[in-house]
Regions:
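Hydrophobic alpha-helical connector segments
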Residues: 65, 79-109, 160-167, 191
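Short alpha-helical scaffolding segments that buttress acidic/His motifs in well-ordered protein cores
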Residues: 62, 96-99, 113-117, 167, ...
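Short, solvent-exposed amphipathic helices
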Residues: 69, 80, 129-136, 140-143
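Helix-turn-helix
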Residues: 15, 19, 23-61, 65
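Hydrophobic/aromatic-rich alpha-helical bundle segments in the mid-to-C-terminal region
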Residues: 127-131, 135, 149-197, 205-207
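Amphipathic alpha-helical segments used for helix-helix packing
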Residues: 91, 104-128
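N-terminal intrinsically disordered/low-complexity leader segments
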Residues: 1-15, 22, 180, 206-207
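Short, basic, alpha-helical segments at the C-terminal edge of helix-turn-helix-like DNA-binding modules
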Residues: 38, 68-74
Length: 207
């Protein structure tokens, strides 16, 4: 029988933390915040239940850490995607392609992201704690749209904030759809329609 780990040595502390975050995200996504237990997470991570507290003092802290980890993964990928393109519409297209790639690599990723809002609504302490994490979505989209506006790539009459809200709604809607629709070809077809719609609504020629 493999002995589960207790207090970690410095050398494997980061690996253990990664395992805890992985198992916690799986549990939060499939079982929900209320039904997730340290015992379940520790069993999957190969450590004792008590060892989790060396990394995360509470379940709230653990959930926030998972959210921060997921946000970093998503927006680091978005940042890398848009830097490979020059125009706003090319970058917009790349966001959908990246979301599809992330979904292929990690099918449960979108489920956790979508579920965060619901969990925060039901748990005031969680909602308060999540505010400690800098929201990268608004910063990312604001910079993307402000840059496009300054280069004349958005309709002159379209405020930057409106463009940000449109992108947030479209990307959020696509994320929610990807949770219920597991057919990747269907999702790619929807992404293609969104891309075409953006050319009609967000290009200067549409003004």
């Amino acid at each position: 029988m493999t002995r589960r780990l207790g207090r970690p040595c410095q050398s494997d502390a980061e690996d253990t933390r990664v395992r805890i975050l992985r198992e916690a995200r799986l549990a939060f996504t499939t079982r929900g915040y209320d039904n997730t237990t340290n015992r379940e997470i520790s069993a999957g991570a190969g450590i004792t239940s008590a060892a989790i507290y060396h990394y995360f003092p509470s379940k709230v802290d653990l959930f926030v850490a998972v959210f921060d980890d997921v946000q970093t993964k998503v927006y680091d990928a978005f940042d890398a995607a848009v830097t490979r393109h020059d125009t706003f519409l090319e970058k917009f297209d790349a966001l959908f392609d990246t979301m599809m790639d992330l979904g292929d690599e990690d099918p449960m990723l979108a489920s956790f992201v979508v579920g965060v809002v619901t969990e925060a609504e039901h748990h005031p302490d969680l909602r308060t704690a999540l505010r400690s994490v800098s929201p990268r979505n608004q910063l990312f989209l604001s910079e993307l749209c402000a840059d496009a506006k300054s280069r004349g790539e958005l309709p002159e009459a379209l405020p930057v904030q409106t463009a940000v809200d449109v992108l947030a709604g479209v990307l959020g809607g696509f994320a929610r759809l990807s949770v219920t629709v597991r057919d990747r070809q269907r999702l790619r077809s929807v992404a293609k329609v969104y891309k075409n719609m953006s050319r009609s609504a967000l290009s200067p020629a549409s003004a």
